[in-house]
Swiss-Prot record:
Protein name (Swiss-Prot/TrEMBL): Lysine N-acyltransferase MbtK
Chain positions recorded as substrate binding sites: 130
Active site: 168
Native species: Mycobacterium tuberculosis (strain ATCC 25618 / H37Rv)
Similarity comment text for this entry: Belongs to the lysine N-acyltransferase MbtK family.
Taxonomic classification: Bacteria, Bacillati, Actinomycetota, Actinomycetes, Mycobacteriales
Length: 210
């Protein structure tokens, strides 16, 4: 059994991430956790820590994120969610910042280890991305089109085996769907999952001319 990350969190490593698959071929099961992408200043990305749980709980209980993510949990549940990711290899929790101020939450995950792999022909090295902006005043202000190309470029550079980055917004999330379409993602249809209807998109890695 994996040792908990910090004292007082004895049950955290036992928490299962709701979307994680375990019926995996060895090639997928053996994958290390996703690599950490990077951004040039004034923006930044870092791996989330258990000490971020209070901040994330406050963010995710804000109405715009509670509606979009349905992760409006108390800090204790966020510590469990973060610990399960940090102790595993399926998903990497990240904190985004600008000018040194934390303001975003991202999860970069192996799509073949995620429930979305039930709905398309997943490659073992496909990665998926979820992202949230904490400050409502910054939503729909151009941060998505500004930062998404930089983040995905770093993901593709850090993991050259990855040929696609997947996005699965709720089918009613028109803002994220527009961003996916603006970025050039291929639409793979709407699909009913266990608790919602998602719109599935794939962003192909850029090809290099010979």
């Amino acid at each position: 059994m994996t040792k908990p990350t910090s004292a007082g969190q004895a049950d955290d490593a036992l928490v299962r991430l709701a979307r994680e698959r375990f019926d995996l071929p060895d090639q997928v099961r053996r994958l290390a956790r996703p690599p950490v992408p990077s951004l040039e200043p004034p923006y930044g990305l870092r791996v989330a820590q258990l000490t971020d749980a209070e901040m994330l709980a406050e963010w995710m209980n804000r109405p715009h994120l509670a509606a979009a993510w349905e992760y409006d949990w108390p800090a204790s549940r966020w510590r469990q969610h973060l610990n399960a990711q940090l102790e595993g290899t399926y998903s990497l929790p990240l904190i985004g910042s600008w000018h040194g101020t934390d303001g975003g939450y991202l999860e970069l995950y192996w799509a073949a280890k995620d429930l979305i792999s039930h709905y398309y022909d997943a490659d073992p090295y496909d990665l998926g991305l979820h992202a949230a902006i904490a400050d409502l005043s910054k939503v729909n202000r151009g941060f998505g089109p500004l930062l998404l190309p930089r983040i995905v470029a770093s993901v593709f550079a850090n993991e050259p085996r990855c040929r696609r980055i997947m996005f699965d917004p709720d089918h009613r999330n028109t803002a994220t769907r527009r961003l996916c379409e603006w970025a050039g993602c291929k639409f793979l249809g709407e699909h009913d999952t266990t608790n919602r209807r998602m719109a599935l998109y794939a962003l192909e890695a850029p090809t290099t001319a010979a």
